[in-house]
């Protein structure tokens, strides 16, 4: 939809891409996704277990309602080749109130 800005756009990893450790992530998110210039990222294996955690870190001024580029790195243990997994990008929510939660999940392959 023209004129609509998504709250977060993931550039790397692409959906269903094959990943290996270290996994470098990058994209753009609205400034409201960050708290202290970061937001959490989790990598889940085929069983849904969290196998790595890290942060998307703003690479420019984050205290804005505009889009902010981010990068991050996740280091994870070896997984069976061809097994599915998911990368969870989670909006920072300093308030802890569920109405401010947001996330996007990207499917990947190991």
Residues covered by each model-derived region:
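Ser/Thr-rich low-complexity repeats and stalk/linker segments
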Residues: 7-14, 18-24, 28-110
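Proline/serine/threonine-rich low-complexity linkers at boundaries of modular beta-sandwich domains
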Residues: 1-6
């Amino acid at each position: 939809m023209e004129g609509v800005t998504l709250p977060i756009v993931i550039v790397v990893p692409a959906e269903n891409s094959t990943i290996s450790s270290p996994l470098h992530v990058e994209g753009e998110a609205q400034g409201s996704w960050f708290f202290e210039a970061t937001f959490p990222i989790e990598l889940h294996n085929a069983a849904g277990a969290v196998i790595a955690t890290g942060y998307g870190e703003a690479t420019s001024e984050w205290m804005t309602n505009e889009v902010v580029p981010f990068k991050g790195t996740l280091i994870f243990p070896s997984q069976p080749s061809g097994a599915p997994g998911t990368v969870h990008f989670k909006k920072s929510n300093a308030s802890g109130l569920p109405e401010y939660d947001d996330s996007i999940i990207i499917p990947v392959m190991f």
